[in-house]
Amino acid sequence: MYAVKLNKDTLLPREKLVQYGVEQLSHQELLAILLRTGNKEKHVMELASHILHCLESLADFDKLSLQELQQLPGIGKVKAIELKAMVELCHRIQKAKSSHSIQILSSYQVAKRMMHELGDKKQEHLIAIYLDTQNRIIEEKTIFIGSVRRSIAEPREILHFACRNMATSLIVVHNHPSGLTNPSENDVAFTKKIKRSCDHLGINCLDHIIVGKKQYYSFREKSDIF
């Protein structure tokens, strides 16, 4: 019997990953592995190619909601959930890498980072950034998704994670999906409440920052609360 010698182009994506390493796979091949199966009309590789052609770039995966993912050809609810989970896991891995030992030197530094992270979000996200004595990031924690109004009377969760991380300082950030960053009365009330609560526990609340896609508002820079 003669052995058939296979090259990269003749191997299936999983076989190619094992033999040559994940770095050698194309976007299409990686997506095909995640999809696992095709549909009645298309083989999984054809389906992966078609989906990628429907997107302007890979970054669009991060922007699509669960419902929008299901509108892509060949993507049902289960595959949409799996893709959404994959994107979020990648996002968290990248965040963990980029956050490690970063020292916060200004509100603008935080705002720039969070504009990139939250600028395209369609719901309000309330995030607390916990810092050590050198203002290095210990943890970035999503406290709430929905409306900051629900969190105004309940700063205890923010402070719970501050104590758990033994943080000496924290910065609170939330986004306005409208892109407009002027603070509302609720934003001002929330800022005063979290500042008082932090002072009571001896934790330094450095700022509350509101971000949109292209602008931000810093209470430390523009108000007398801090």
UniProtKB/Swiss-Prot annotation:
<dbReference type="InterPro" id="IPR025657">
    <property type="entry name" value="RadC_JAB"/>
</dbReference>
<dbReference type="GO" id="GO:0008237">
    <property type="term" value="F:metallopeptidase activity"/>
</dbReference>
<keyword id="KW-0479">Metal-binding</keyword>
<dbReference type="InterPro" id="IPR046778">
    <property type="entry name" value="UPF0758_N"/>
</dbReference>
<dbReference type="InterPro" id="IPR037518">
    <property type="entry name" value="MPN"/>
</dbReference>
<feature type="domain" description="MPN">
    <location>
        <begin position="103"/>
        <end position="225"/>
    </location>
</feature>
<dbReference type="GO" id="GO:0006508">
    <property type="term" value="P:proteolysis"/>
</dbReference>
<dbReference type="GO" id="GO:0046872">
    <property type="term" value="F:metal ion binding"/>
</dbReference>
<protein>
    <recommendedName>
        <fullName>UPF0758 protein SUB0843</fullName>
    </recommendedName>
</protein>
<keyword id="KW-0482">Metalloprotease</keyword>
<dbReference type="InterPro" id="IPR020891">
    <property type="entry name" value="UPF0758_CS"/>
</dbReference>
<feature type="binding site">
    <location>
        <position position="174"/>
    </location>
    <ligand>
        <name>Zn(2+)</name>
    </ligand>
</feature>
<feature type="short sequence motif" description="JAMM motif">
    <location>
        <begin position="174"/>
        <end position="187"/>
    </location>
</feature>
<keyword id="KW-0378">Hydrolase</keyword>
<comment type="similarity">
    <text>Belongs to the UPF0758 family.</text>
</comment>
<dbReference type="InterPro" id="IPR010994">
    <property type="entry name" value="RuvA_2-like"/>
</dbReference>
<dbReference type="Pfam" id="PF04002">
    <property type="entry name" value="RadC"/>
</dbReference>
<keyword id="KW-0645">Protease</keyword>
<feature type="binding site">
    <location>
        <position position="176"/>
    </location>
    <ligand>
        <name>Zn(2+)</name>
    </ligand>
</feature>
<keyword id="KW-0862">Zinc</keyword>
<feature type="binding site">
    <location>
        <position position="187"/>
    </location>
    <ligand>
        <name>Zn(2+)</name>
    </ligand>
</feature>
<dbReference type="InterPro" id="IPR001405">
    <property type="entry name" value="UPF0758"/>
</dbReference>
<dbReference type="Pfam" id="PF20582">
    <property type="entry name" value="UPF0758_N"/>
</dbReference>
